Amino acid sequence: MAPNIRKSHPLLKIINSSLIDLPSPSNISTWWNFGSLLGICLITQILTGLLLAMHYTADTSLAFSSVAHTCRNVQYGWLIRNLHANGASFFFICIYLHIGRGFYYGSYLYKETWNTGVILLLTLMATAFVGYVLPWGQMSFWGATVITNLFSAIPYIGQTLVEWAWGGFSVDNPTLTRFFALHFLLPFLIAGITLIHLTFLHESGSNNPLGIVSHCDKIPFHPYFSLKDILGFTLMFIPLLILAFFSPNFLGDPENFTPANPLVTPPHIKPEWYFLFAYAILRSIPNKLGGVLALAASVLILFLIPFLHKSKQRSMTFRPLSQVLFWFLVANLLILTWIGSQPVEHPFIIIGQMASFTYFLILLILFPTIGDLENKMLY
């Protein structure tokens, strides 16, 4: 019998074992679609970003007008730009749902996969931040100034670190140039870490909604989940295209239609919607260093999640108390997102402080406690 090239060719057999003949649990739900959706988001962002970079000029006097030129004069430049800007929002929607699914079903117990995933989230956040600075509008400039300035809270080396990052004594041309270089580089780093993420995942195999070992009931990835993933791509691209065609600026800030002016501060400096929860936590502490530490902790706390798992069951499928707590956490994050978009005044300050406190309380204390309690109730 002739050898199957799919299984014998050195390159094709890697693809085959990852995407075609991969043994997958038969009962994984649509919540397992988001990994592949993140992959397609990354590919879309790299392609649209590459096309935008061909028309972009990383110079403070030309950046804003080069983006305007792309939208007005380049063939379908407006569409490429709208897909890239809104594609970032969909990237974050997918990654937050992907993390939420991992949290709900106990996927974080695959520690290496989880940790590389958190590193991917941090890299994605860095990429989105430096990318937001590139159009050189008002919110781009002031966002860059405020967020990079946070590093000055680091004792002893802070101010030196900030000036080193800026390439001068304020956010200026060197800052924009290096941010463009970083924004071009980081997506390829994300692609590399994604391969490590998948390598670790394929070592253990996928988790499933029941959180039990599924070796006895595996099915091939293709055609079952490849088709399911294509359906997922379609269901994601439809709203993305609707947003890009009909209301491309819905998620943006109107302030960014004004070219950057170091002499005029916008009334409310705020990041894009996907950073608002962390921004609310940053603002809830009236001390600069404390706020920076809370901001870092709000994301880095994900590294601790595997160590805070106290339940004898992996998934939350049959743990009603943990489920209630999980949805409390989701509601809490939505409240933080809303607070981050509001001005710093009463009653938003106290609501933000309460929500920030609750966020850490749920993750660090209530989840392990409830896990222990459920063990006592069930066993």
Curated annotation (Swiss-Prot):
SUPFAM superfamilies: a domain/subunit of cytochrome bc1 complex (Ubiquinol-cytochrome c reductase) (SSF81648), Transmembrane di-heme cytochromes (SSF81342). It holds the Pfam family Cytochrom_B_C. Heme 1 (or BL or b562) is low-potential and absorbs at about 562 nm, and heme 2 (or BH or b566) is high-potential and absorbs at about 566 nm. It is found in: Mitochondrion inner membrane. Gene3D superfamilies: Cytochrome Bc1 Complex, Chain C. Its cofactor is heme b. Component of the ubiquinol-cytochrome c reductase complex (complex III or cytochrome b-c1 complex) that is part of the mitochondrial respiratory chain. The b-c1 complex mediates electron transfer from ubiquinol to cytochrome c. Contributes to the generation of a proton gradient across the mitochondrial membrane that is then used for ATP synthesis. Binds 2 heme b groups non-covalently. GO terms for molecular function: metal ion binding; ubiquinol-cytochrome-c reductase activity. This is Cytochrome b. Belongs to the cytochrome b family. The chain crosses the membrane at residues 34-54, 78-99, 114-134, 179-199, 227-247, 289-309, 321-341, 348-368. Its main location: mitochondrion. Coiled coil: none annotated. Heme b b566 binds at H98, H197. The cytochrome bc1 complex contains 11 subunits: 3 respiratory subunits (MT-CYB, CYC1 and UQCRFS1), 2 core proteins (UQCRC1 and UQCRC2) and 6 low-molecular weight proteins (UQCRH/QCR6, UQCRB/QCR7, UQCRQ/QCR8, UQCR10/QCR9, UQCR11/QCR10 and a cleavage product of UQCRFS1). This cytochrome bc1 complex then forms a dimer. One of its GO terms (biological process) is mitochondrial electron transport, ubiquinol to cytochrome c. Heme b b562 binds at H84, H183. A ubiquinone binds at H202. PANTHER family: CYTOCHROME B. GO terms for cellular component: mitochondrial inner membrane; respiratory chain complex III. Keywords: Electron transport, Heme, Iron, Membrane, Metal-binding, Mitochondrion, Mitochondrion inner membrane, Respiratory chain, Transmembrane, Transmembrane helix, Transport, Ubiquinone. It is a multi-pass membrane protein. It comes from the Eukaryota.
